[in-house]
């Protein structure tokens, strides 16, 4: 520790940090401490705090244990900063704030307020957090939320002020003075601008655009970046903390509340989003803000972080202007109006701009780009179909006592055959208290404990009853007819499962037997990979809901029902996004809703070459999603599209499937289902492929074809027969009726134009056999 008034050198300036995780489940090893580990990485990152982790500990949600650790780290270890994670909510055992209040000597309410304000900009549930920040001696204590995402965001909210706060506590006079001098040199914020004279909305927007450009030039000259009003945008403060590296804050679209931006379109230009809410240049970090500590001298970078939070003149930009000024995805605004130009129909593509991708490459790409989801702790009864994220160990022996394998008599093997007195009985669920002596036996039932003195069991079939009680209710004497050997028909302790044995390995896909095994070993809570949530929508102006009466030019939507049922058949939770018209604004709004609520979004229609097929443009222009492929060399399903979008470090998966009913179902089985299986942690998510014989001749197509078929087994034949479902036109949903397989037919060549009845082919299983 530095003495009072001591001038710290660069070496002395190293910040010593402790990370304290408060969690019952982590303490009992039922969950991994993701937030604590992540905070350690953030603290040590040289482009962030650049601190040293001097202490790390996990404690249960107990006030005394929390207090004891905090006091020890403050008074004995003399840490500069303590970050706690967990226990700040409303649950009965969330007591971290109470423990902190009993330890600190002075409060730091500004830091708690900064975290609350930042959290409320992210989610209204931020109001349920109860952080306490304060000082004990020369140690700063900060309460952070228990989730990895929440703790990282709150750490980022207070990060710009942390180095200066610690310098103040350590009396680092020179560094404190440098910061204060830098702040004194800052110009005062200008007064609020007068509202423009009342004109037409279009004129008002144009005036504001000019005004923004002038203000931007002034800011460039002064080197001071503006900050946006916290109530005007949902862009988190994490995006404003320009020195957070992309490796920690994943690039992605920031979600705006849909009422945040007012959008208008001028007659003279295409319908592009024009944001009229007050959006400042803080949305787009300037080079001044992006500067990292190792690229500047002294404390300039730290002062720059403080400058970015001072009030400045707000500016107004259209969404397209904001996006053009921002190169990173953190600052893309997802508004409710699309920037896709729908007016120039004559200039649309006549040939697809997307290259043809082979089926193998497309499938590999999907699996490579699809992440495995995080974990959660569930009750074992809810484990059907889930994948274990941790090994499961037995905490007891099974059986926990020597148990009888059969109904019969517990005997002493050394006594041999002969007549024996019966001293009682041992039943399952009871522990016998008597000891079998020479010349005695005890009647036992299957699964019952073996009494002391006995070392074998003779089944009832190998005995004769010699004597019974007068009323016939008791056996008094029995004759043993065989020679028993020691251990005969006895399951010793731990015979089935030994204490500490791994009974289920990480990655196990749980079924009924695994659920029963968990019950057997008494493990009622297990850590599993999360199920992906899947949102499904159909696109097309021609579509009606199934319950609607047909109208001229309309058809009923079958894709959504079929896709939802397919996903639900595999056990995944779904969200029905309904029917979306062929309009970029509607598509964008529906995609935004799906992105905010689900892990995977499935659309059908709007991906081919029609003049109303806008989906790929919305993904590219509005969402800035990465489209990995837009056409696949296969039949059916040529225009199948796969895209990903990273938001706040979370990857969203988007499958834009063809609109033809059969194409949608086939591509869902080929691409979507394996991706979902990978997301839930299944080690081999590939579909099941078997061999089958063709029941009829099949003509080949120039493209690899997935031909719908019904698999049946004939008596005493090892391979099933694959019967075609008939006409394979992609619009004919009847071809999917009763189909439980897809014939994987090769493309046509000069030598092979068809396959003949009886030939063996590969078949992908898509239904119950």
UniProtKB/Swiss-Prot annotation:
Palmitoylated. Palmitoylation is stimulated by GABA type A receptors activity. Palmitoylation by ZDHHC12 regulates clustering at synapses. It is found in: Postsynaptic cell membrane; Cell membrane; Cytoplasm, Cytosol; Cytoplasm, Cytoskeleton. The modification Phosphothreonine is found at residues 198, 265-266. Residues 181-232, 260-299 are annotated as: Disordered. It comes from Mus musculus (Mouse). This is Gephyrin. Its cofactor is Mg(2+). Homotrimer, homodimer and homooligomer. Interacts with SRGAP2 (via SH3 domain). Interacts with GLRB. Interacts with GABARAP. Interacts with GABRA3. GABRA3 and GLRB occupy overlapping binding sites. Interacts with ARHGAP32; IQSEC3, INSYN1 and INSYN2A. PROSITE patterns: MOCF_BIOSYNTHESIS_1, MOCF_BIOSYNTHESIS_2. InterPro entries: MoaB/Mog-like_dom_sf, MoaB/Mog_dom, MoCF_biosynth_CS, MoeA-like, MoeA_C_domain_IV, MoeA_C_domain_IV_sf, MoeA_linker/N, MoeA_linker/N_sf. In the N-terminal section; belongs to the MoaB/Mog family. In the C-terminal section; belongs to the MoeA family. It is an enzyme of class 2 (transferase). The modification Phosphoserine is found at residues 188, 194, 200, 262, 268, 270, 338. Pathway: Cofactor biosynthesis; molybdopterin biosynthesis.
């Amino acid at each position: 520790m530095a003495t009072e008034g001591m001038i710290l050198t660069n070496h002395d300036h190293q910040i010593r940090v402790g990370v304290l995780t408060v969690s019952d489940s982590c303490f009992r090893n039922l969950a991994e401490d993701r937030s604590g580990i992540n905070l350690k990485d953030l603290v040590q990152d040289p482009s962030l705090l650049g601190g040293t982790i001097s202490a790390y500990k996990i404690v249960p949600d107990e006030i005394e244990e929390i207090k004891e650790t905090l006091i020890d780290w403050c008074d004995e270890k003399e840490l500069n900063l303590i970050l706690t994670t967990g226990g700040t909510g409303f649950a009965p055992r969330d007591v971290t704030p109470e423990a902190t209040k009993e330890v600190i000597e002075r409060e730091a309410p500004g830091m708690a307020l900064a975290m609350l304000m930042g959290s409320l900009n992210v989610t209204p549930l931020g109001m349920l957090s109860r952080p306490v920040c304060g000082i004990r001696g020369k140690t700063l204590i900060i309460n952070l939320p228990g989730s990895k995402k929440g703790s990282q965001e709150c750490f980022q909210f207070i990060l710009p002020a942390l180095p200066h706060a610690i310098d103040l506590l350590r009396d680092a006079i020179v560094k404190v003075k440098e910061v204060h001098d830098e702040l004194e040199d800052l110009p005062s914020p200008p007064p609020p601008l007068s509202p423009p004279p009342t004109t037409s909305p279009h004129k008002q927007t144009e005036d504001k655009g000019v005004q923004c450009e002038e203000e931007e030039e002034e800011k460039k000259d002064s080197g001071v970046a503006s900050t946006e009003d916290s109530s005007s945008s949902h862009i988190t403060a994490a995006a404003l903390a320009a020195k957070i590296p992309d490796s920690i804050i994943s690039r992605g679209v920031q979600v705006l509340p849909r009422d945040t931006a007012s959008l208008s379109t001028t007659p003279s230009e295409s319908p592009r989003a024009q944001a009229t809410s007050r959006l400042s240049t803080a949305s787009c970090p300037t080079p001044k803000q992006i500067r990292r500590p190792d690229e500047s001298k002294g404390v300039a970078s730290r002062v720059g972080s403080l400058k970015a939070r001072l009030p400045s003149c707000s500016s107004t930009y259209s969404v397209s202007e904001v996006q053009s000024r921002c190169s990173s995805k953190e600052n893309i605004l997802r508004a409710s109006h699309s920037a896709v130009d729908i007016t120039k129909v004559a200039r649309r593509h006549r040939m697809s701009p997307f290259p043809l991708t082979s089926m193998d490459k497309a499938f590999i790409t999907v699996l490579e780009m699809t992440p495995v989801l995080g974990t959660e702790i569930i009750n074992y009864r809810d484990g059907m179909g889930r994948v274990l994220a941790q090994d499961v160990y037995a905490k007891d022996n099974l059986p926990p006592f020597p148990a009888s394998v059969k109904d019969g008599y517990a005997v002493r093997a050394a006594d041999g055959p002969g007549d024996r007195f019966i001293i009682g009985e041992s039943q399952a669920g009871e522990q016998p208290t008597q000891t079998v002596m020479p010349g005695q036996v005890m009647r036992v039932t299957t699964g019952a404990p073996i009494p002391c003195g006995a070392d074998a069991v003779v089944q009832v079939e190998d005995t004769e009853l010699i004597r019974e009680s007068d009323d016939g209710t008791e056996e008094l004497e029995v004759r043993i007819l065989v020679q028993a050997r020691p251990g005969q028909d006895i399951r010793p302790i731990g015979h089935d499962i030994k204490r500490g044995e791994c009974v289920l390995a990480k990655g196990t896909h749980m079924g009924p037997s695994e659920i029963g095994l968990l019950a057997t070993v008494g493990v009622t809570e297990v850590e599993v990979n999360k199920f992906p949530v899947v949102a499904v929508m159909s696109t097309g102006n021609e579509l009606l809901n199934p319950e609607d009466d047909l109208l001229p030019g309309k058809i009923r939507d079958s894709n959504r029902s079929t896709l939802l049922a397919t996903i639900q058949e595999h056990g995944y939770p779904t969200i029905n996004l309904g029917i979306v018209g062929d309009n970029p604004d509607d598509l964008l709004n529906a995609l935004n809703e799906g992105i905010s609520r689900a892990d995977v979004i499935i659309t059908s229609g709007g991906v081919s070459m029609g003049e109303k097929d806008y989906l790929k443009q919305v993904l590219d222009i509005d969402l800035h999603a990465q489209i990995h492929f837009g056409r696949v060399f296969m039949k059916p399903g040529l225009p199948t599209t796969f895209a990903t979008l990273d938001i706040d470090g979370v990857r969203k998966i988007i499958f834009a499937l063809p609109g033809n009913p059969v194409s949608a179902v086939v591509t869902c089985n080929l691409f979507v289902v394996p991706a979902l299986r990978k997301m839930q942690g299944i080690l081999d998510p590939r579909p099941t492929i078997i061999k089958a014989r063709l029941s009829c001749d099949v003509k080949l197509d120039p493209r690899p074809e997935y031909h719908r078929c019904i698999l049946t087994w004939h008596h005493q034949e090892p391979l099933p027969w694959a019967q075609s479902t008939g006409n394979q036109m992609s619009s004919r949903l009847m071809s999917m009726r009763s189909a439980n397989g897809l014939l994987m037919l090769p493309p046509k060549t000069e030598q092979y134009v068809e396959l003949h009845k009886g030939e063996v082919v590969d078949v992908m299983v898509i239904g119950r056999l």
